[in-house]
């Protein structure tokens, strides 16, 4: 195997398609960005704790407000465009258009994506995915980095703002009028 990205193993230096993702051995996960395949390392316990708590908070908010959006935790397939060379599994995806959902996952950009940074995914989350999500039409992108004690919120609508928070802050969700997540109460 060769290495790609931030030491994330690639199978080989060639162009892949979504069909190649489906031929991976059971239990092996990968993402496909512009035809390059990135094997995904298993998440840490802390990563999973953050993901589980966030999904629970988001799901509860949607249900209590009788919202039309749906929240999904990885592994959940997101096909960002019509081409067959980009396939991602964001840590958390919130999709508000039911027409984008089918049995295979989400076709098109989710409204809100959260990536929880791990040592192997830093370059992907901070650079490559940031650009892919922005240009695919994601409205809001959060990067949760427990190592740096920060949450970066990119709002890709309107003024395209970027806000930086700590893991002790209240963070406003841009796709909802009255939704704020209290990271300080999550006991991460």
Where does each model-flagged region fall?
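Gly/Pro/Ser/Thr-rich low-complexity, intrinsically disordered segments predominantly at protein N-termini
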Residues: 1-188
């Amino acid at each position: 195997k060769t290495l790609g990205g931030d030491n994330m193993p690639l199978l080989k230096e060639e162009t892949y398609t979504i069909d190649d993702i489906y031929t991976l051995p059971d239990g092996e996960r990968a993402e496909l960005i512009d035809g390059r395949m990135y094997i995904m390392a298993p998440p840490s316990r802390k990563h999973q704790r953050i993901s589980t708590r966030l999904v629970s908070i988001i799901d509860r908010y949607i249900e209590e407000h009788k919202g039309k959006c749906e929240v999904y935790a990885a592994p959940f397939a997101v096909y960002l465009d019509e081409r067959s060379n980009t396939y991602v599994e964001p840590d958390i995806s919130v999709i508000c258009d039911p027409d984008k959902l089918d049995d295979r996952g989400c076709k098109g950009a989710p409204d809100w994506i959260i990536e929880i940074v791990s040592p192997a995914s830093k370059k992907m989350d901070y650079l490559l995915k940031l650009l892919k999500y922005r240009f695919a039409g994601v409205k809001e992108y959060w990067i949760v980095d427990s190592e740096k004690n920060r949450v970066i919120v990119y709002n890709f609508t309107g003024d395209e703002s970027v806000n930086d928070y700590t893991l002790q802050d209240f963070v406003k969700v841009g796709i909802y009028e009255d939704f704020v997540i209290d990271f300080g109460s999550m006991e991460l």
